[in-house]
Curated annotation (Swiss-Prot):
Protein name: Cell shape-determining protein MreC
Family note: Belongs to the MreC family.
Residue numbers spanned by region Disordered: 276-295
Signal peptide per UniProt: 1-34
Cellular component annotations (GO), alphabetically ordered: plasma membrane
Chain coiled-coil ranges: 66-112
Pfam families registered for this protein in UniProt: MreC
Annotated keywords: Cell shape, Coiled coil, Signal
Function (record text): Involved in formation and maintenance of cell shape.
Keyword Coiled coil: yes
Amino acid sequence: MPQFFLNKRLIILLISIIVLVALVGFSLRDRENASWPEQFVKDVVGFGENIVAKPTSFISGAVDGVVDLKNTYTENQHLKERLEELAQLESEVADLKKENKDLKESLDITDSIRDYDPLNASVISRNPTNWNDQVEIDKGSSDGVKPDMAVTTPSGLIGKVTTTGAKSATVELLTSSDVKNRVSAKVQGKENAFGIINGYDSDTKLLELKQLPYDMKFKKGQKVVTSGLGGKFPAGIFIGTIEKVETDKMGLSQTAFIKPGADMYDLNHVTVLKRSAEAGTTDDDTTSSDTTGGQ
């Protein structure tokens, strides 16, 4: 009896193996429609893959977006830095061009003045509270600079030295509000007219040339230069041009309003006119200066 059941189990096992092999073979055959168990398994697996794939794809895309955004930001920062560097370079080039032009024109001044030793200098400071009054330059007594020396730019006279240190000096501008600031000048024409630069209108930005003869006619655009009568400034340094002329209240003299040739607002490179040994100031010069009341 036990032998029978043993054989029966063996037979069932063999039949099961045969059926399983048949099912496997059947499932491996090419056919258009899958059985419902196969389709069920495929649907479950596909649904699971879809659930996993979408978040994974979203996260991957988000990470890629963040990386791209960071790269774009970094690139923009580099471009911005380059633009700033180019802007700075352009500004430096413009400053160098202007400086080169000023220095070339300063050399032209050097060639045009014979009895004076021109000394080129740079403006190192300017007080905003008295912008029209003074500037500081980088040349002083150790360079031979002395008070009352004329200071010019390529465009014309700007003022005179008032005080000196060893390595710097103070220049009082023609536009100074100091009533004692005077320069002897003349209006060029068929007949020269002499007067004194004394005063500045900050509203019109015009110098005042006073004590001109009441009976002389003047035209807009006539040139005004230093007269040299003060004995300290060389004659012929350009100051500016006439804009208009007014007669004083008493009718005894005229005042011409002069547009400065030099840009008094923007001063960078200047020239100090040092008196040479042959053209030094004498007692006669000092007397002349006191008589005319100007430089």
